[in-house]
Structures are given as structure tokens and as C-alpha cells.
């Protein structure tokens, strides 16, 4: 697995990933309506120029399969939100998301000096929840019925990891 900076050169892959309805089922609401390539270009330009985010592409065997990183990076509060989307579903359940997550946590805590990294995950997304717990995230709360997919409301789980927890985990 290789993780490197996400750029506008990844536009076709990015558009392909967010067009995969299975991959974005529990992702950002912005990805749910079918989007054209121009929308994807504008979105990608926006996130890759955002100084408060760190956006990476995940590659396996010379194939780009998704993206991950940190958004809303706050130097004052020393926290950020973790995100990941593996758009090539044939790479699900192979530990790639877990490995990518560990890489992002290492970067956030070691390089950026963050104190807290957090995320939200849709309650039905069991595979993601297992992966997040495996890399050390803990459940902090529930945002009740915060998401609506296919006319059904479900809750989002707020998870977080503190630097001291990550350091203790790294020692064991």
C-alpha cells in the first residue's frame, strides 16, 4: 500500500469512487446525488487547496483505490477529523482501510502534534466501526437519527482517539 498526496491529477479516479453508490452509501451526503465530472473537479480543487486538511490517495499494486486524511485541522485546539473512502469495493475487508487509518493517525499525532482525532460513522457501517476500533478509536457519543439514506433515518456514532491513548497503544 502506498499513500501519497491527493491532487487534481486523481480526478478521474476520484470521480469514479464517488460515483460508486455502494462505496458512498454511508459517506458524505454531498456524494449521494449523481455528480458530473465538473462537480468532482471543483470539489477536488476545493479540498486539495484547503490549508486545514491533509488529503491522501491510497494505492495498492499501482492502482488508486480511495482516499483518506484529516480535515478541519485546528492548530489552536490540536484536533482534526479523520476520513476515508475506499472506492474500489473489491479492496474492502482486506485490512487496507485499517492500515491507511494507522498511517493517518501516525501522521496526525507524530508529525502534526495533534491531541485528538475524531470521526463520525453511520451506525449500519459495521465494517468501518470494527476498523476504527481496531486502530484505537473509542465511541464517544451518538448523534441520533442524523442521517437519512433511502428514506430511513439512522444514527451516527462519534468516535475519538486522544494522543495519550495512541501513545499507550503504540507502547503495547
State the predicted function of each range.
Residues 110-120:
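Conserved GNAT acetyl-CoA-binding A-motif
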Residues 118-121, 138-154:
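Conserved catalytic-core motifs of GNAT/GCN5-like acyltransferases
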Residues 132, 137, 159:
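Conserved active-site tyrosine of GNAT-family acetyltransferases
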Residues 63-66, 127, 153:
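Glycine-rich acetyl-CoA-binding "A-motif" of GNAT/NAT acetyltransferases
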Residues 152-172:
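Terminal substrate-recognition subdomain of acyl/acetyltransferases
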Residues 93-107, 129-134:
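Conserved acetyl-CoA-binding loop-helix of GNAT-fold acetyltransferases
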